[in-house]
């Protein structure tokens, strides 16, 4: 045979009209006349690279054939039901003949879903258990990544920096098969507005087919890419007009009561973005910080500092409404101990602790009385992936509903026992009170059993209000938005292109946080992971389509020395979710990753200082030393 030429880039795929799914379009108004009538106009291209998940524990699974023609799979997966369906399909079995169990994962970030299906085939053929553990090099070569994107934009704006029209094409490298690409592209379209009201838009999404691995879900799921391009456009507008970037941002923010509808038709009802940005400014005094950097840059000939902020508005829910559901199973034993099972999976994000906290709160018992059992398709079926930052929202509410049902039954037993109305029964501090009389939770559990009252319940939750029209790309895809803001300071060596993050200040809207310690860890971790995507993590494919950066020696994730010496993460205070989420909390897994765009913008700011902030550099992501140095030379050349 003769090898065919490989299609490896987005540009090649577009030229050959090679796509894994049909183009997507989101529009509002007529963009061509709006662009033509705009006082100012810019057009250009931007590229951002992919990113490997680099979970500490690689892909690993164990498949064991059963004695009745069934299959048991223990897997490191975020989506047990997807593995169940995949195995059943490959083996020609009904779903009830395949059980998938997940105790925990050593990280995932979107990269662990369906890979375990192959070992079930091997186990089925061999009629004996088969275990798979991919070495790091094989894992990186065989699995999908964050989608690289090519953006082409044409924006019209007025003299104040107000965007009047935007024609934007977002082309994603989907790889060899569709995988998650269509959904990632949809979410990118839904976040290409970020915090800004865009009166006239045409967003076009292209899912490009190339001869690389099929790219897949990754923390943020298209949101980071969508936000990256609009922030770049905002910066270029500011430089062209000689305005401060933050001033242009504020002039384009969504407002309360007007200019509050997204390009996909959802009203931004919970808008607190200006409040979050103001809180960041009050906390760190951005004006004084910027003056300090100006003084440094005037004195330093080689090293230049940059400062940039990044506001975020990130939608929470799966774009596909059917996925926004969850189940949970709660058992109370006669000694007062509790077992909880739900459809979410634990990958180090603290989901099991948060859901256990919910049940502990309902019963008013200590957390150590609750055991969360391994996620299993045989216990809670038909689950959605633990993804889209919705794990706590969905599974926490399902567990709440199950625990509430049991609590109501137990309260009825207690009311009968104390001869008082059920409304007078109070659960508090591991005890049940009726006035000045009380019994322990375990005593009530035993009494309920004696009274033949069920101490088990299944809970279910479906996210309300959401709907989405895939044909028109309109509706309410998100239950609510999570907001945040960041400011980052970097130093750039203009002789080598090397950069260093010196300080980062982060504020994240977590609603009424279920667990501030966990949430702060998520904020910091997501930020550093986002830094890696935008600065050091570069995927490089050779001319034959072989990945050459397939290990820590060639693929550079951030290390401990890359973390800013000053990194302050804060949870926005006194900001409960206006929607009826679990205890009015908000999701935290994905949104903080986009705060790291402040680092990339700060690098651009440092380069722009070479032109007295009158020009925006041509800089793609990741901002490797080579790219930064090229951008520096390009800016210097334009100034000359």
Where are these regions (language model features)?
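Structural alpha/beta core scaffold segments of enzyme domains
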Residues: 1-507, 566, 598-611, 628-640
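Substrate-binding beta-hairpin/strand module that engages nucleic acids
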Residues: 135-137, 368-381, 542-562, 619-621
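Amphipathic, heptad-repeat alpha-helical segments used for oligomerization and assembly
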Residues: 221, 386, 390, 578-591
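Generic long, charged, amphipathic alpha-helical segments
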Residues: 368-374, 558-585
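Cytochrome P450 core scaffold surrounding the K-helix E-X-X-R motif
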Residues: 511-515
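C-terminal structured "cap/appendage" subdomains that terminate the fold
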Residues: 581-600, 604-611, 616-617
């Amino acid at each position: 045979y003769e090898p065919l030429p490989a299609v490896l880039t987005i540009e090649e795929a577009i030229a050959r009209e090679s796509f894994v799914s049909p183009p997507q379009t989101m529009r509002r108004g007529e963009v061509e006349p709006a662009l033509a009538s705009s006082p100012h106009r810019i057009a250009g291209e931007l590229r951002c690279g992919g990113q490997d998940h680099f979970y500490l524990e690689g892909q690993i699974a164990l498949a064991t054939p059963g004695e009745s023609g069934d299959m048991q799979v223990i897997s490191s997966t975020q989506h047990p039901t997807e593995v169940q369906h995949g195995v059943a399909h490959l083996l020609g079995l009904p779903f009830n003949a395949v059980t998938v169990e997940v105790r925990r994962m050593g990280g995932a970030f979107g990269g662990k879903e369906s890979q375990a299906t192959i070992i079930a085939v091997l186990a089925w053929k061999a009629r004996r258990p088969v275990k798979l553990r991919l070495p790091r090099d094989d894992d990186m070569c065989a699995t999908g990544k964050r989608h690289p994107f090519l953006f082409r934009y044409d924006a019209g704006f007025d003299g104040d920096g107000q965007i009047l029209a935007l024609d934007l094409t977002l082309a994603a490298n989907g790889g060899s098969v569709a995988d998650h690409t269509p959904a990632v592209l949809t979410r990118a379209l839904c976040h290409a507005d970020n915090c800004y009201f865009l009166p006239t838009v045409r967003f076009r999404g292209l899912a490009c087919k190339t001869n690389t691995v099929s790219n897949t879900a990754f923390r943020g799921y298209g949101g980071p890419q969508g936000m990256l391009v609009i922030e770049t456009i905002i910066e270029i507008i500011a430089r062209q007009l000689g305005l401060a970037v933050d001033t242009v941002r504020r002039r384009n923010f969504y407002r309360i009561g007007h200019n509050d509808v997204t390009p996909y038709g959802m009203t931004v009802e919970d808008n607190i973005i200006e409040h979050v940005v103001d809180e960041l400014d009050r906390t760190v005094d951005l004006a004084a910080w910027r003056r300090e950097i100006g003084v440094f840059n005037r004195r330093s000939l080689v090293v230049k500092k940059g400062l940039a902020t990044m506001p975020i508005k990130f939608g929470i829910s799966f774009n596909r409404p059917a996925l926004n559901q969850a189940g949970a199973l709660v058992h109370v034993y006669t000694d007062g101990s509790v077992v909880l099972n739900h459809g979410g999976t634990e990958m180090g994000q603290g989901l099991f602790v948060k859901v256990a906290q919910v049940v502990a709160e309902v019963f008013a018992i200590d957390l150590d009385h609750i055991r969360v059992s391994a996620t299993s398709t045989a216990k809670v079926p038909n689950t959605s992936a633990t993804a889209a930052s919705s794990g706590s929202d969905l599974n926490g509410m399902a567990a709440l509903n199950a625990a509430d049902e049991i609590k109501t039954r137990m309260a009825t037993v207690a009311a009968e026992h104390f001869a008082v109305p059920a409304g007078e029964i109070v659960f508090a501090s591991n005890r049940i009170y009726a006035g000045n009389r009380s019994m322990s939770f375990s005593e009530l559990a035993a009494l309920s059993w004696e009274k033949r009252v069920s101490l088990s319940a299944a809970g279910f939750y479906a996210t309300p209000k959401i709907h989405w029209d895939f044909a028109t790309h309109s509706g309410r895809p998100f239950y609510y938005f999570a907001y945040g803001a960041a400011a980052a300071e970097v130093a750039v060596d203009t002789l080598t292109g090397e950069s260093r993050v010196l300080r980062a200040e982060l504020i994240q809207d977590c609603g009424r946080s279920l667990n501030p310690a966990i949430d702060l860890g998520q904020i910091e971790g997501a930020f550093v992971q986002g830094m890696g995507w935008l600065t050091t993590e570069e995927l490089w494919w050779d001319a034959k389509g072989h990945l050459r950066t397939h290990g820590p020696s060639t693929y550079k994730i951030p290390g401990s020395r890359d973390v800013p010496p000053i990194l302050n993460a804060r949870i926005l205070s006194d900001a409960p979710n206006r929607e009826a989420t679990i205890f009015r909390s908000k999701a935290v897994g994905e949104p903080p990753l986009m705060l790291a765009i402040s680092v990339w913008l700060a690098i651009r700011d440092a380069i722009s200082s070479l032109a007295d902030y009158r020009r925006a550099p041509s800089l793609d992501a990741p901002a490797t030393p080579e790219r930064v140095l090229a951008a520096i030379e390009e800016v210097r050349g334009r100034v000359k």
